[in-house]
């Protein structure tokens, strides 16, 4: 089984890294360089428009892009650099050496700048969006740019791990791939986390979903789970698997 997570918008470079956590280089260096070149050619106003962010964030990320290619630009393994709720609950800094190695072989993280990342891949601080339409040398929307590179790569990696993909990423990340091809080539199972409402319905609450995704990922990795069915036995943040509300492609967990 392979697990797919989304990147986080927030990044922080730790001052110290646990010595037992080995590091690797990102896979799609050539493509990343093209996106970084396109982004670094943008001024603050252009970044604000392309990324749909306020001026303060645009100024911060303009500085990041201007220093992106410098050798002393800070870096950290992707799983430790991303600071969103998913990664807080994943808590990769607590992994032992064997957990870390296993995670680097069974977890991929989507990224609008780096394409697909292993947890151990060293990254720099950045902000990018899939909907951004970049100039030269990309000349395309980021989603479209990545699709030809990532689709076959993901299918191959899932097949190497037994042909099962646990999709714990956000829906928009499917646009980085030809998702119909992915679903035809491998088995995709999406865990859904919902909360009961006063009217009797069920609703997905973003913060709870992110927490559950991080905990579920940590569980699957540290327990060395090989098949998607094994996640049914785990109850992250009080979410209980409901087989009567699930099907072969969607596993529904409801908060008790």
Curated annotation (Swiss-Prot):
Recorded superkingdom: Bacteria
GO CC terms, sorted: cytosol
GO biological process: response to hydroperoxide
InterPro entries: YaaA (IPR005583)
Signal peptide as annotated in the record: none
Family: Belongs to the UPF0246 family.
PANTHER family: PEROXIDE STRESS RESISTANCE PROTEIN YAAA, PEROXIDE STRESS RESPONSE PROTEIN YAAA
Name used for this protein in its record: UPF0246 protein PG_1544
């Amino acid at each position: 089984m392979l697990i797919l997570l989304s990147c986080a918008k927030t990044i922080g470079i730790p001052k110290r890294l646990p010595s037992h956590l080995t590091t690797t280089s990102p896979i799609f260096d050539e493509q990343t360089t093209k996106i970084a070149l396109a982004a670094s050619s943008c001024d603050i106003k252009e970044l604000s428009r392309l990324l749909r962010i306020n001026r303060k964030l645009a100024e911060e990320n303009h500085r990041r892009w201007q220093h992106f290619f410098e050798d002393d630009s800070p870096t950290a393994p992707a799983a430790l650099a991303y600071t969103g709720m998913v990664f807080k609950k994943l808590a990769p800094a607590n992994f032992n050496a064997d957990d870390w190695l296993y995670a680097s072989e069974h977890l991929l993280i989507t990224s609008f700048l780096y394409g697909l990342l292993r947890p151990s891949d060293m990254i720099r601080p950045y902000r990018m969006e899939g909907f951004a339409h970049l100039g030269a040398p990309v000349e395309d929307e980021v989603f479209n740019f990545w699709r030809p590179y990532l689709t076959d790569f993901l299918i191959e990696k899932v097949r190497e791990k037994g042909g099962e993909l646990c999709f714990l990423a956000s829906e928009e990340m499917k646009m980085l791939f030809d998702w119909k091809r992915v679903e035809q080539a491998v088995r995709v199972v999406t865990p859904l986390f919902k909360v009961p409402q006063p009217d009797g319905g069920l609703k997905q609450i973003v913060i709870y979903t992110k927490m559950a995704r991080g905990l579920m990922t940590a569980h699957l990795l540290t327990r060395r789970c090989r098949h998607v069915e094994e996640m049914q036995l785990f109850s992250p943040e009080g979410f209980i698997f409901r087989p009567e509300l699930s099907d072969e492609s969607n596993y529904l967990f409801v908060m008790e």
